Amino acid sequence: MKTIIVFLSLLVLATKFGDANEGVNQEQMKEVIQNEFREDFLNEMAPMSLLQQLEAIESTLLEKEADRNSRQKRCNGENVPCGPNHSTCCSGLSCEETFGYGWWYDTPFCVKPSKG
């Protein structure tokens, strides 16, 4: 019973004097709010905006790098059908009508350009 009385009295004292710290906390909060709008705080914000700008630049560079590493479109090799319904011929080849099998398939083929 005596221990309960001691704990209850401590509880009452803690609640009574615990409110005194609340006023101190409110004063500290007011100081923090006032300090936020000073020049020091604005000077701290400038590097943050610079950091955000650098991150934006970095993201665009990474996108360009990802595009550069992407796979190129495939091209047709020699003796492969070409034309409007097919992909383009590789470099060094031209899309021409041939006498051989071109007439059978009714489409031009990728061939080496004739030198004549």
From Swiss-Prot:
It is found in: Secreted. GO terms for cellular component: extracellular region. Glycans are attached at residue 85. This is U16-barytoxin-Tl1f. The keyword Disulfide bond applies. Pfam families: Toxin_22. Transmembrane segments: none annotated. Disulfide bonds join 75-90, 82-95, 89-110. Expressed by the venom gland. The keyword Secreted applies. GO terms for molecular function: sodium channel inhibitor activity; toxin activity. Residues 21-74 form a propeptide. It comes from Trittame loki (Brush-footed trapdoor spider). Belongs to the neurotoxin 14 (magi-1) family. 06 (ICK-Trit) subfamily. Keywords: Cleavage on pair of basic residues, Disulfide bond, Glycoprotein, Ion channel impairing toxin, Knottin, Secreted, Signal, Toxin. Ion channel inhibitor. Residues 1-20 form the signal peptide. InterPro entries: Toxin_22. The presence of a 'disulfide through disulfide knot' structurally defines this protein as a knottin. Its main location: secreted.
